[in-house]
Amino acid sequence: MGRIIGIDLGTTNSCVAVLDGDKPRVLENAEGERTTASVIAYTEGETLVGQPAKRQAVTNPQNTLYAIKRLIGRRFEDEEVQRDIEIMPFNIVKADNGDAWVEAQGQKMAAPQVSAEVLKKMKKTAEDFLGEEVTGAVVTVPAYFNDAQRQATKDAGRIAGLDVKRIINEPTAAALAYGLDKQGGDRTIAVYDLGGGTFDISIIEIDEVEGEKTFEVLSTNGDTHLGGEDFDNRMINYLVDEFKKEQGIDLKADPLAMQRVKEAAEKAKIELSSTTQTDVNLPYVTADATGPKHMNIKVTRAKLESLVEDLVQRSLEPLKVALADADLSVGEITDVILVGGQTRMPMVQAKVTEFFGKEPRKDVNPDEAVAMGAAVQGGVLAGEVKDVLLLDVTPLSFGIETMGGVMTKLIEKNTTIPTKADQVFSTAEDNQSAVTIHVLQGERKQATYNKSLGQFNLEGIQPAPRGMPQVEVTFDLDADGILNVSAKDKATGKEQKITIQASGGLSEEEIEAMVQEAEANKEADKKFEELVTARNQADQMIHGTKKQVEEAGEALPADEKAKIEAAIEALESVKSGDDKEAIDAKVQELMQAAQKLMEIAQQKAQAEQAGADAGEQPKQDDDVVDAEFEEVKEDKK
């Protein structure tokens, strides 16, 4: 196997590293920089990447693309994409499949296609250093990237001519780089990763047994709409507002001016990490009838902190959830690692120190650690690095929709990957010949509050009473966090498979909302689950009682039959409602009314010496779960 390089494909900056001997080494690009700006510019007949693209952005704002990672694997209708449309100087357009694409030089392009330009530069940088062609790569993604975004990242690699051997989570990669050469036994580390577009927190345990190190991710959480770009936007808005107060001119209508303000805001933000005051000085930023206008605004560190304080605060809530999911207290964390350029901000460092009660490590380069860890994982896959085992996790649960609109989870969040899970489900209707498998991702009990990843049909099921067929659904989650689903009729052996497609993926904001809503709505989820259980019990009671009435025939007196039918009608009138107590009460009434049926059934069973009959109906498997599937032929739901 050839060399496998490590690439940190970032929202704002990207980085590439290789193993040099047994140590990861960050490589300098053609401009002599260890990181490359994730900026792509399309000019007449030329594509520029990195600093060359950034330098010409002011004169070519509509064809200079940046923060494309915020669009990768995303749908055009996503609320976050719509907000980006308002602030980006370039055009974000809707593709035929509904994805968010971009437009430059009159050409529409998919986000992976644009990101591939950055990956190509990373590939070329590695090839120049190694003196040989490179095809294998480990590429990192935010821990909270969903199935669609991971697949889109792999697609970008393929477009760039890379075989992406593994997708790994950024905090995990940083932990690999940090822990590889550390001595002194077991450690439990918290990786706080605040990058250009996303925020992740991962709790990782490093164990060492007889020289072999195991990096096991215990939990991960995050906010996929929080990063340095959001900090920049706060500064940009402040500068634009201040200029409008002074000059009465709104710069937002001027793309060239806004590109200059964006660059100045980013520069000022960075400077305020090492100084307490800076000047934003933009001569000739715009002009009106009275002549040219200049921007000259003093910004203090205190002012910047007041603008972004809520953003920093937002990053603390996922820390609490991650610790709870790992079943750890703050005191059990031995090391805190800061990753991502935005963690250089003193306010961020102070808040993290306050939360964990200890200073973050200073021996980790926040811009380079992720790429270095990816290179280590590349070495592991290529067989160059021995005695290292990486156990990563899936950030969100996977499941299918079952009877009553419930999401039944097959793979729980924070499960080590790769993993495989299967469960047996059954039909909801008699003689059902097909079922629809509806795949979901999220944390809520109610299926509609989770994201639909896709659905497919399993046809050709042998006609049988409801609850009798056995359909085995298998979820196979690979080491990249990408899902494959199959369904198999155990009676006929017929099987259907699906790979979840990128166009059906979740939006970043939807993932963030799922986990946060799940935390806030645990009680509501519990009540909903109890209501669905009551509804399902009512359905089973009605179905079973009607069948018993039919089997009893004339043995059931007419007055008893009328009483039972009235109780069934009363239960049917409330079973679809939201009043669990009313459903439970009507179920009890039906049970009381059906006492005579039980007596008749017992008498009949005794007369026929029940149990001796070889043709007895097979007992339903206790593990079979009632599932709400579609009868494709009859359009049942």
Swiss-Prot record:
Keywords (alphabetical) are:
ATP-binding, Chaperone, Nucleotide-binding, Phosphoprotein, Stress response
Q: Which residues carry this modification: Phosphothreonine?
A: T198
NCBIfam families linked to this entry: PRK00290.1, prok_dnaK
Taken from the UniProt record, the cysteine pairs bridged by disulfide bonds within this chain are: none
Locations of Low complexity compositional bias? 601-615
Q: Which gene encodes it?
A: dnaK
Give the matching InterPro entries: ATPase_NBD, Chaperone_DnaK, Heat_shock_70_CS, HSP70_C_sf, HSP70_peptide-bd_sf, Hsp_70_fam
> What does its record list under induction?
By stress conditions e.g. heat shock.
Q: Which family does it belong to?
A: Belongs to the heat shock protein 70 family.
Q: What does this protein do?
A: Acts as a chaperone.
Name by which UniProt lists this protein = Chaperone protein DnaK
Q: Name one Pfam family in it.
A: HSP70
According to the UniProt entry, which residue ranges have a biased composition of type Acidic residues? 623-637
Q: Where is this region: Disordered?
A: 601-637
Where does the source fall among the domains of life? Answer: Bacteria
Extract the GO molecular function terms from the UniProt entry.
ATP binding; ATP-dependent protein folding chaperone; unfolded protein binding
